[in-house]
């Protein structure tokens, strides 16, 4: 895997992209975290085809108001116990977790990073459980590393959730 400083820089870039789509009118972001690269940063030709299809579907809905898709974007992260979080997504996103432990999701508190041990479907989002108890203030990261895991949480259409980094966990 990549070194931690490089991963954190990737996380900051991915979070800036996600937030830009929330604050800049008519700007949309589509996920590419699950797509193959030909080197460290360039999408493969096959990935570009998938990316183009995603962009077209998102543009139909977000820019033209027609039937299409939108990128699953995390709305809120709410603590649901000593080790659990509720990950809330926008309307129209019936989310499906990655199988088994989700290596791409972490909580970070004063003691450091905590790995996700299980992620399950629940109405309106996902419920994630972590390997140890965590204390607030804490932050949530998903698919933020330079080299993300092979399996990511997706909505029912197959669109992966947007990466996020440093999202505040609410009580």
Predicted regions mapped to residue ranges:
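Cell-envelope and extracellular/periplasmic
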Residues: 1-171
